[in-house]
Amino acid sequence: MARSVVVALLVLLSLSGLEAIQHAPKIQVYSRHPAENGKPNFLNCYVSGFHPSDIEVDLLKNGKKIEKVEHSDLSFSKDWSFYLLYYTEFTPNEKDEYACRVSHVTFSTPKTVKWDRTM
């Protein structure tokens, strides 16, 4: 009985220690298909490798937040870091700029990554 209590306490202590570990998210912005002006596509922002799980992700068009955005469920990897995919339908053209802005405890200010249409 005493041994199982000690084991349970060790498990709880190790789990509480996970919250202290912080990892900055990796941000990847890409389109589902190669960009063609005037042709509908999907803009994706894949955010991975972050811890803790609290995160704010916005897709931007010309610096303004896009309202109609969907995202995957929060998931975690084998190393207990988290990942998410945010996406929206869009139609690229020559004049509009698209980006993904991420706020996380590991950043002193939000980080913005622009979509490179050549990637």
Swiss-Prot record:
The keyword Signal applies. Keywords: Disulfide bond, Immunity, Immunoglobulin domain, MHC I, Secreted, Signal. Pfam families: C1-set (PF07654). It is found in: Secreted. CDD domains: IgC1_beta2m. Residues 25-114 form the Ig-like C1-type domain. GO terms for cellular component: extracellular region; MHC class I protein complex. Residues 1-20 form the signal peptide. SUPFAM superfamilies: Immunoglobulin. GO terms for biological process: antigen processing and presentation of peptide antigen via MHC class I; immune response. Disulfide bonds join 45-100. It comes from the Eukaryota. Component of the class I major histocompatibility complex (MHC). Involved in the presentation of peptide antigens to the immune system. Belongs to the beta-2-microglobulin family. Heterodimer of an alpha chain and a beta chain. Beta-2-microglobulin is the beta-chain of major histocompatibility complex class I molecules. This is Beta-2-microglobulin. It comes from Ateles paniscus.
